[in-house]
Every structure is written in C-alpha cells, then in structure tokens.
C-alpha cells in the first residue's frame, strides 16, 4: 500500500484518546532568514509505510503529504566530531572496559553555518509533515541542542519541554580536563500555532517507569529522566551504530505522545531503534538513513520482531 493511500485510509477512524482538545490547524511560519535552497524531487517517488529507505530524508520525504505524521523521533548528527569526542570500541583499555577511539564521521563534522543550514532544512521538512495534533522529539548534546533550539524558534516550531536525559552509566572523561558528560538534551516540540498536540497525561503520572530512578509513582513526570544508556544484547545482535539509543527511550516518547496506529517518522534511522520501538508499540513507521550498512542492520532487527 502506498503512503498516500495508507494515510487516507485513517481519516474515518475514531479520534484517539487523550485530554480533550480542539482540532485546529497550526499557523505556518514564513522565515526569511532560512538560507536553505528548495530541493527538487521527482514527483513520481512513491514510498511505502513500515519501511526504512536508503537516502536523504529531506529529498525522499518530499513526496509525503503535508500534515500526515503523528510523531517524529529525530536523532540527527550532533556535529561533535571536532577531534575531541570519544567513542568506546571494545578492546583492552584497563579499568574502563574497552579501548577508546575518536569518532571521525564525515556526517558529524560540519562548519557551523553549514550545520545551522542543515538543521533548518530538516526541521522545516519535519514541520511540513507534522500534524497539528503531532509532536517531535529531537536528541542533542551541548554541541547541537542550542542550534536546534534556535532553529526551531526561527521556524516558529514551539518547544513544549526541554528534557535532560541523565545517564548514570556514562563513560568517564579520560583527559581529566573537564567534567564527565553524563546527560543529553531532548527537545519535545510541536509545529507551532494552537496547542493541539497529543499528550497522554495520565500515562505520564501513572505509567510503569520502574526503570527511571527519579520518577515518583503517581506524580507528574518531570523533565529530568534517569534512564540507563546500556543496550540489551538483542538490540545489537545484528550490529550497532556509534550513536545508537536504547529502544526503551523511544518507547517513552511514543507512550507519552502517540497512540497505536499512529504514523511515526524517523528522519535519521541509524540502526533502527526508533523504528523497532514504533513497531513494538503498534505504530506504523517510515524511516530514512543514508548509510546502506545501517539500513541492513535496521531491517534485520525489524524482521526479527514477532508480529502481534
């Protein structure tokens, strides 16, 4: 089934659960400071749902209809590969569980103006695709979160919350020249305009968050999350990505802001954790990844999931 047909087939389904709200259309933003040139994409591209595509999100997603996506989970490049970011490769460094090597990925090392232009470009496309009732979750660190925040403001994308993901099991800082980086930033945002985004408020209070040492049962969820970054062996059975996130984190996003049957967009799919979470939670999904090797890993992970 093509994407357009699949999306149209949901128009007559009952409204989802959640706090009462009006269905309103968010006001679009015109940003004259956006330096991005438009992408020209053939109009004959047809994308199917529940698939990860090899290629550039901005180019391939141009064939998707406006306001067709319920939730976006984005883990874009942090632009952190400036010669000082370390990533563990299993090896023989005593006391730290492995040898440490610098990340040297081309996709994670851009001049500042180029990175801002890239961020504006993909966020503008994400906003176009997001429903007024939808929202997006965007990962970042101190290298990127500030730029993402500014880009959202330039595009009149409203930030709902800034979340601190505290990682108790963070790798130590080997240089002894700075504090150990033990958190990442997550921006939860909607497309702007009237606040019609879905929020499963009762779940945020009463859900099972036993893996979070800071969450108080029965109390409102706060914006500091204590979730371990370790991945179970089955999440890396077919290979791994240097910036791979645990599936449990994407499942939290989904349970807070989506419903079964919703469409989840993953612009930077990597090895597929967010798509795996979407499938396991009963969502439809569509993902994009530029590296064919990671696409293959992601597809193997998805194929290994038992159908409900």
Where do the language-model regions lie?
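Arg/Lys-rich, glycine/proline-spaced intrinsically disordered segments
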Residues: 12-22
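Core catalytic lobe of class I
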Residues: 2-10, 27-34, 38-297, 307
């Amino acid at each position: 089934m093509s994407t357009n047909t699949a999306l149209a087939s949901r128009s007559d389904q009952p409204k989802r659960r959640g706090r009462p709200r009006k269905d309103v259309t968010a006001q679009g933003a015109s940003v004259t400071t956006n330096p991005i040139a438009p992408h020209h994409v053939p109009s004959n591209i047809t994308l199917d749902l529940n698939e990860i595509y090899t290629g550039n999100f901005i180019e391939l997603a141009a064939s998707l209809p406006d306001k067709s996506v319920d939730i976006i989970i984005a883990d874009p490049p942090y632009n952190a590969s400036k010669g000082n970011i370390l990533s563990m490769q299993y090896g023989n460094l005593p006391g730290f569980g492995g040898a440490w090597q610098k990340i040297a990925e081309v996709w994670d090392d851009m001049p500042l103006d180029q990175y801002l232009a890239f961020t504006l470009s993909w966020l503008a496309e994400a906003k176009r695709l997001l429903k007024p009732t939808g929202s997006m979750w965007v990962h970042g660190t101190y290298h990127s979160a500030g730029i993402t925040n500014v880009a959202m403001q330039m595009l009149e994308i409203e930030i709902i919350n800034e979340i601190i993901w505290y990682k108790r099991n963070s790798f130590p800082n080997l240089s002894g020249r700075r504090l150990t980086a033990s958190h990442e930033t997550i921006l939860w945002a909607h497309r702007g305009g009237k606040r019609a985004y879905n929020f499963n408020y009762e779940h945020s209070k009463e859900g099972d968050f036993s893996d979070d040492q800071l969450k108080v049962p029965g109390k409102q969820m706060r914006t500091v999350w204590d979730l371990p970054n370790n991945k179970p062996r089955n999440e890396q059975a077919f290979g791994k990505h240097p910036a791979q996130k645990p599936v449990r984190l994407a499942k939290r996003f989904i349970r807070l802001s989506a419903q079964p049957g919703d469409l989840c967009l993953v612009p930077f799919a990597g090895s597929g954790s967010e798509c795996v979470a979407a499938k396991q939670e009963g969502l439809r999904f569509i993902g994009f990844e530029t590296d064919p090797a990671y696409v293959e890993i992601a597809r193997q992970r998805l194929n290994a999931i038992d159908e409900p």
